[in-house]
Amino acid sequence: MSQVLTPLLDRVCFPQDLRALPESYLVQLANELRTETIDAVSVTGGHLGAGLGVVELTVALHYIFNTPEDRIIWDVGHQTYPHKILTGRREKIRTLRQEGGLSGFTKRVESVYDPFGAGHSSTSISAGLGMAVASALKEEKKRKVIAVIGDGAMSAGMAYEAMNNAGALNARLIVILNDNDMSIAPPTGSMSAHLARLVSRPSYRHLRERVKMLSEKLPKFFWDKARRSEEFARGLLVGGTLFDELGFYYVGPIDGHNLGHLLPVLKNVREYPHGPVLVHVVTHKGKGYPPAEASSDKYHGVNRFDVTTGKQVKASSNILPYTKVFSKALVEEACHDDKIVGITAAMPTGTGLDSFAEKFPEKMFDVGIAEQHAVTFAAGLACEGYKPFVAIYSTFLQRAYDQIIHDVSIQKLPVRFAIDRAGFVGADGATHAGSFDIVFLATLPEFVVMAPSDELELMHMVRTAAAYDQGPISFRYPRGEGIGIDLPQRGEILEIGKGRVLREGNRIALVCFGTRMSEVLRAADRLGAKGLSTTVADARFAKPLDKDLMRRLAREHEVLVTIEEGAIGGFGAHLLQFLAQEGLLEHGLKVRTLKFPDEYLNHGSPEKVLSTIGLDAMGIVNTVLTVVGREIRME
């Protein structure tokens, strides 16, 4: 553990310790909390910029509100490292995102101070509204519910759906809009802070309500004029007309790094007797750490780094990551086809589409955190003859499943889905694991579902998708590097629904769907050394299956094992159903499917987790030896 000097923070284990401090100590506490956060993340890696941006807000919220009785719900959750330090988890903060350590997000089973788990964006207001309504039903009049949501997350429709509902219900809910990017209405110094304090005071609210009651007794013409005049004045001075229309009482904008501004406003809104309130705070990602302030995008998620220089520790490698291979392949295809366009949902760098945007800026569309819109937007482009590639993480594609079915699949529109971060993703854990895309896509009629076994196969699949116009098509690939093979300038077009055999044998058939192929080949070597002749097949397609190849493998082998990084119901399940329908399970063939277990996988090292669940060479060999009844003796 690094020797960070934090004498005041050392006195705070839980929020009640924080609330025992004089208010004049809080600036020093915030500075120490920021120092501790920087030092901890330098050891573990993780999300840095977002947490540094809410240090003062975190201190203020736990100081003003009676947590955990009052509920603070953090949207997404990657900004909660300071929150974790203040809520009894400082001793474990240097285990963040490590196996057996703290989650990088909020997690209900981890602490009573995490009332709602997160990892995906834009859920906090809906969850908070549910809790606020539950408190009202139970007549818990003292409990406050606070949802903290970033301006980026406000680009998702779900946030506005929740606000609309909260306004209609007149629920006692406090929403903190953490504006650290869009600058909807940046604060303008002391005047803005003064106005925020003014409009948050009970006296202003009571006056406003009395004027409203009086105006309602006047003819409608006068009431409409009065309402519009007030909206104009408040919108001109302090913003917030949109939120007013949704039924929220708007306060702000205020400086989210100035405790002298935050504390009085939060005290005032804490006592607001009824209806939802929105407090607009403006913050800066990476606040207080110059390298992060200078490059907030690069310090959103970081590897371990040197605190003094800010230099991140990265393993040197000349092997391209799968994301980079996809990016280069898509740019190459777009050079040959002017109908190709790229679409991302607020992840241009993570999906590699930033390179596409540099080359074809007019054909690149970042729609914000709006996966549902992204898919239907792509469907509209496909209707007009364009070839949209929707590049999206597997875990986020789940958010657009109705659009995939209703707007794309039923209409057989040729939308291309480039599914990044497929399979186990490591430190981000269950909320980000790409476990389910094979299952929920391969069940759709006439939906082509592909997975490459290496980076060259990924290039082939990008070109295949670009050439395919008969309906929707997808290809999935993992986080991390390929295997380091030489790559051509451009991939080849694959025959739809046709796999390939990499190695011929006659007793054991190993059928791989995806990038576990290197482990499958190692397993085949070990089985061969034990006298078990092994065929290795690259399925390429989960849908449509290569039926001819699967029939041959079933008829010519004693044991057939499928290998995939995905949940129950994926490639192995589809192959088993085909074999059953064909009567190929009735003549002694023994089939096993290696996949994810029926549970959510927690954060940890990908190599260790995949080994534990049997998706490495040793696990494959053990499975085969168990089936054939041999004693397992592995070196």
Curated annotation (Swiss-Prot):
Chain residues that bind thiamine diphosphate: H78, G119, H120, S121, G152, A153, N180, Y289, E371
Gene Ontology molecular functions: 1-deoxy-D-xylulose-5-phosphate synthase activity; magnesium ion binding; thiamine pyrophosphate binding
SUPFAM superfamilies to which the protein is assigned, alphabetical: Thiamin diphosphate-binding fold (THDP-binding) (SSF52518), TK C-terminal domain-like (SSF52922)
Pathway(s) per entry: Metabolic intermediate biosynthesis; 1-deoxy-D-xylulose 5-phosphate biosynthesis; 1-deoxy-D-xylulose 5-phosphate from D-glyceraldehyde 3-phosphate and pyruvate: step 1/1
Co-factor requirement: Mg(2+); thiamine diphosphate
InterPro entries: Dxylulose-5-P_synthase, THDP-binding, Transketo_C/PFOR_II, Transketolase-like_Pyr-bd, Transketolase_C, Transketolase_CS
CDD domains: TPP_DXS, TPP_PYR_DXS_TK_like
Pfam entry (one): DXP_synthase_N
PROSITE patterns listed in its UniProt record: TRANSKETOLASE_1
EC number: 2.2.1.7
Binding site for Mg(2+): D151, N180
Entry keyword set: Isoprene biosynthesis, Magnesium, Metal-binding, Thiamine biosynthesis, Thiamine pyrophosphate, Transferase
Cofactor binding annotation: Binds 1 Mg(2+) ion per subunit. Binds 1 thiamine pyrophosphate per subunit.
Coiled coil: none
GO biological process: 1-deoxy-D-xylulose 5-phosphate biosynthetic process; glyceraldehyde-3-phosphate metabolic process; terpenoid biosynthetic process; thiamine biosynthetic process
Broad enzyme group: transferase
Catalysis performed (reactions): D-glyceraldehyde 3-phosphate + pyruvate + H(+) = 1-deoxy-D-xylulose 5-phosphate + CO2
Family affiliation: Belongs to the transketolase family. DXPS subfamily.
Oligomeric and partner information: Homodimer.
Cross-referenced HAMAP family: DXP_synth
Function: Catalyzes the acyloin condensation reaction between C atoms 2 and 3 of pyruvate and glyceraldehyde 3-phosphate to yield 1-deoxy-D-xylulose-5-phosphate (DXP).
Protein name per its UniProtKB record: 1-deoxy-D-xylulose-5-phosphate synthase
Lineage: Bacteria, Pseudomonadati, Pseudomonadota, Alphaproteobacteria, Hyphomicrobiales
Name of the gene this protein is made from: dxs
